[in-house]
Amino acid sequence: MNTYKNSLNHFLNLVDCLEKIPNVGKKSAFKMAYHLGLENPYLALKLTHALENALENLKTCTSCNALSESEICEICSDESRQNSQLCMVLHPRDVFILEDLKDFLGRYHVLNSIENVDFNALEKRLIKEKIKEIIFAFPPTLANDSLMLYIEDKLQHCHLTFTKIAQGVPAGVNFENIDSVSLSRAFNSRIKA
């Protein structure tokens, strides 16, 4: 039995926690734990503080479901943004990615999960903000195509134009794995859904 490893419970627990982060394997987790625990403990303390602050202050916007540190996010409270377009995305991280492109100046709506979509509240928002177009910014998959059709069907009485970002985004690939030029081109070449 390896008693050396058994004597490093705290270190191995840190490795185990880091390994649970998406795209971090055992070797990377070990390197990070070693760096934080031995080579740069000041960074570890800053990271601990940043994590505590994020957990205390991060929430979702009550209007669009994007990440926010207040009840209404900065995008929803920005009166200079175009109200006629609403870009629907699957995850809050998609808002970050699309905002970095600086191609879209409208509003967002993050679905998170189709099971929890409050279509009544969404419809009230569409009317209140005078939305005329919903842009689906979903990665191209059969499931997402079905989701777009479902949403169109639920909102057909609202007399909206439904568009989706153009193909060119590879099927089955998440936004964070696509270069900004391809994503920007796909967004600006969106087509009627």
From Swiss-Prot:
The keyword Metal-binding applies. A zinc finger (C4-type) spans 61-76. Pfam families: RecR_HhH, RecR_ZnF, Toprim_4. GO terms for molecular function: DNA binding; zinc ion binding. It comes from the Bacteria. Residues 84-170 form the Toprim domain. GO terms for biological process: DNA recombination; DNA repair. Keywords: DNA damage, DNA recombination, DNA repair, Metal-binding, Zinc, Zinc-finger. InterPro entries: DNA_Rcmb_RecR, Rcmb_RecR, Rcmb_RecR_Znf, TOPRIM_dom, TOPRIM_RecR. NCBIfam families: recR (TIGR00615). Belongs to the RecR family. May play a role in DNA repair. It seems to be involved in an RecBC-independent recombinational process of DNA repair. It may act with RecF and RecO. This is Recombination protein RecR. It comes from Helicobacter acinonychis (strain Sheeba). The gene is recR.
